[in-house]
Structure formats: structure tokens, C-alpha cells
Amino acid sequence: VLTTLWHHYEVDNIRVALRGVEAGATWDQVLHLLYPMPRYVEVTLERMEKMVRSGSVTGAVSVLRGTQYHSLLNHALTRYEEERSLFPLEVALDLGYRRNLWDVVHSLGKQDREMALKTIGMVLDIDNLLWALRFRVYHHLSEVEIINYTLPMGYEVADDDVRLIARGGD
């Protein structure tokens, strides 16, 4: 679980690299925004640099081939190309990371799983509720889009709670 939690920072670094590509930033500009990650990484600094130097978001995603992040981002590339917004790519990263974390928690032994579910489950519930609100209020997404951009599981927050927010209920 701890290694998977550490990947949260790797996901943030990938997001920073993609934003750097989109903004036309140099590698030196992006490098100073990255979390230092001396271990537990799948995407090395060298690979991050290749992403930024690729010159395009599509090229940056292709640099991630062979990692767990490539398929997540590749799946969202069509929507990125249609909208010219990093939003679908960033949501794909967030959802993929949290689904993986949920799976890792559920693979633990009974006692460890129960303890991890209480702490990590609560964080995932909060993320899900905040995402649903943010997607409705600030991004004006449809109910279906909000459901697609939130986690289908939770600890104490039920899917119906997220659906209620997506519909605009109190």
C-alpha cells in the first residue's frame, strides 16, 4: 500500500509534465515543479524529460508506453484531441491511480484491509464527493459525465450519493 500511495506523487509529476508540454515550457522550467522521487517510480526523470521534449501531448503520452499510465492516458487522448483540454487526461490519471489504490487495499489481509479501508476509503470518499461537486458546479458536466469521471466505489459514500450530486440534488 505504501508504494502505491507513493505513486500519487508520480501521477502529479506526470500531470506537471503534460501541462509543461501544453504550455510549451522547457525541461528546466518543468523540472523545478516536480516532486523529487528517488525511488518507487515507474516513470524516471529521464522519461519525464523525454515527455516534455516530445513537443506534443500525444508524443508525451507515447513516451509512457510500457507503463501503467500509458493505457489510461491513451484511452483519454481522443477526448483531449476533440476538446484541446488536458482535463480528460488528468481525470484519467486520477481515476486510474485511485482504482489501483482501492484494488491494492482490497488485496491486503483481513486486519490490514479493514484498517486501510477506514483511512484510505475515507480519503477516496472525500475525493469523490469533491470531484462530483466540482464537475457539476465549475465544469458544468452532465450527470452521465460526472458519473463517468468519479469512482464507482467508496467506503461510506454510496454511488447514489454521487448520483444525487450529479443530478443537482441537495
Show the residue positions of the predicted features.
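Extended alpha-helical surfaces
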Residues: 1-170
